[in-house]
Amino acid sequence: MKKISIITPSFNQGQFIEQTIDSVLSQNYNNLEYIIIDGGSKDNSVEIIKKYQKYLHYWVSEKDNGQSDAINKGLKLATGDIFNWLNSDDYYEPSTFKKINEYFTPDDVLVVSGRNNILKDNLIVRISSGLYLYNSLEKTIGNAKIDQPGTFFRKDAIDKMGLLNPSLHFIMDREWWIRYLLLFGLNGIKKVDDVFVNFRIHNNSKTNSFQDDFVKEALNLYYSIASIYNVPEASKFEKYFKISLIPEFIKLPNISTDLLQKSLHYFWLHQGNISYAHDDYKTAALFLSLINVEFLQKEDAQLYFSLKNRIKFLPPFLKKLINRIR
């Protein structure tokens, strides 16, 4: 039975954290290391944590520099074979750890990624699609999406990836995942259909309240990749967007500039597609204008041309009307 280390970063989530803790401990997994890093909560969080302290490997309540910093504190203490973090407003499905232990076989499996129930007002509104994996590394990097709560890493991989970037507060998991892809490619990844986690969307959740910040950090992340690895596309970011380099960016050795260049064009295509879906034709057209279609695979080039034509010939009001009819 492999040792599983779970970290819960917490700050003022007293209304949810007991269910989070219970979902970890009630797994009845004998080789568990559970760490809670609280950022100095002023609500009843600490009182709840103390109720369970004899079952915890370690806990602390002290001021920190945000979620990434809290997770890093836990990572430095973690000694398990398998690692993940669970936010203090989410909770695991029963038997998750048992399944994870089984899925991390054989030993060359470095990542196991399942799916999440998305909850609103304690009701399941949808089930996540899971990790984005494509048939090309550049597309997987450009469209990088990780269902973090349901994605577990082997500690051996994390030792090479390093800690989370503490300057990131919204897409630290995405940057971490890109680091994995740059180090290991598409190798060692096992994607499964199991639902591992219940992920809450509520008024105070980051996912619900800070969408613009997610987009801003994503632009800064891909710009930093372009700039620090000396990819020519960095100049396009500088020309068209208000961006800045991410502090404490970790540059990995021996990374192909050609791979990164193609990945950036996939990032622009992905952002263009999202902007179009949100009826932001101006932003969609800007992202598409940056793309060299020669860097895209055939089916993705078809999407590129389709988006350009729809932006040109299908005005937003007509698009909305068609969607209503459907």
Language-model segment annotations:
Residues 22-31:
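Short, acidic, metal-binding catalytic loop of nucleotide-sugar glycosyltransferases
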Residues 38-47, 87:
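A conserved acidic beta->alpha catalytic loop
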Residues 45, 71, 92-99, 122-123, ...:
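Acidic donor-diphosphate engagement hotspot in glycosyltransferases and nucleotidyltransferases
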Residues 62-78:
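Glycine-rich, basic loop-to-helix element that forms the pyrophosphate-binding segment
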Residues 83:
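Short aromatic/hydrophobic "clamp" motif used to bind/position activated sugar donors
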Residues 91, 95-126:
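Conserved donor NDP-sugar-binding/catalytic core segment of glycosyltransferases
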Residues 129-224, 229, 233:
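Conserved nucleotide-sugar donor-binding catalytic segment
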Residues 227-229, 243-326:
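Membrane-interface aromatic/basic loop that binds lipid-linked glycans or pyrophosphate carriers
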